[in-house]
């Protein structure tokens, strides 16, 4: 019996990513391909019908998809001090986009492509803060940013994941704004967080968190390599 039955949109998206990667690895001739395809598409439809609304994607749900609080993905101490919980997060949208891009690579489907394109547009037009050269992290339901924060790990991760999705889902003629955004994010992270002993974690209300987190360092490797290759 699961101890935690919460349905996180983030988790559904990672399941899509894993199934789609499996599909690409085994190929259409494998007898398991159709099963993986059907499960991935069922999860895609579930996200689009149960985890989405007119403004974007929700975060966490009961097993029957009644919305619940999202403490696990919005557990920043500053938000907790204010008794605030993010209704939307940049991180969830990023991994929904990642899953959809991988699914489209495995099995081109126009509904998947269009849903991914909407995610890309939301990053460019809503979550990206061009004045501060960063992605905002935590939001209320109407996309009001809840915290003056830059997550260096998420920004360098987004710099390559968003571009990967743009190359996969968009015609070349529509990619230029995403290239500019992704290169700007990577450059801002390099300027603000890169040191000779790894990448800083984040900065919140002007205070830098110097903690070295494993996944932040890993995303830094691929993010800067991707920026170099652009």
PLM-predicted stretches and their roles:
Residues 1-230:
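Glycan-recognition and catalytic cores of secretory/periplasmic carbohydrate-active enzymes
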């Amino acid at each position: 019996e699961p101890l935690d039955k919460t349905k996180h949109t983030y988790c559904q998206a990672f399941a899509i990513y894993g199934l789609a990667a499996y599909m690409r690895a085994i190929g259409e001739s494998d007898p398991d391909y159709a099963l993986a395809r059907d499960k991935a598409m069922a999860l895609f439809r579930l996200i689009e019908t149960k985890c989405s609304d007119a403004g974007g994607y929700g975060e966490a749900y009961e097993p029957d998809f009644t919305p619940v609080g999202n403490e696990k993905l919005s557990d920043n101490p500053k938000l907790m001090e204010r008794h605030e919980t993010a209704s939307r997060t940049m991180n969830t949208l990023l991994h929904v986009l990642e899953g959809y891009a991988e699914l489209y690579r495995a099995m081109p489907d126009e509904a998947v492509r269009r849903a991914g394109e909407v995610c890309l547009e939301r990053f460019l037009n809503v979550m990206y803060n061009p004045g501060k050269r960063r992605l905002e992290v935590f939001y209320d339901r109407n996309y009001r940013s809840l915290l003056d924060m830059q997550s260096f790990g998420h920004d360098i991760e987004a710099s390559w994941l968003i571009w990967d999705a743009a190359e996969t889902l968009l015609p070349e003629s529509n990619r230029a704004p995403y290239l500019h955004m992704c290169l700007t994010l990577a450059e801002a992270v390099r300027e603000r967080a890169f040191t000779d002993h790894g990448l800083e974690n984040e900065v919140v209300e002007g205070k830098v968190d110097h903690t070295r987190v494993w996944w932040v360092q890993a995303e830094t490797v691929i993010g800067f390599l991707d920026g170099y290759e652009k």
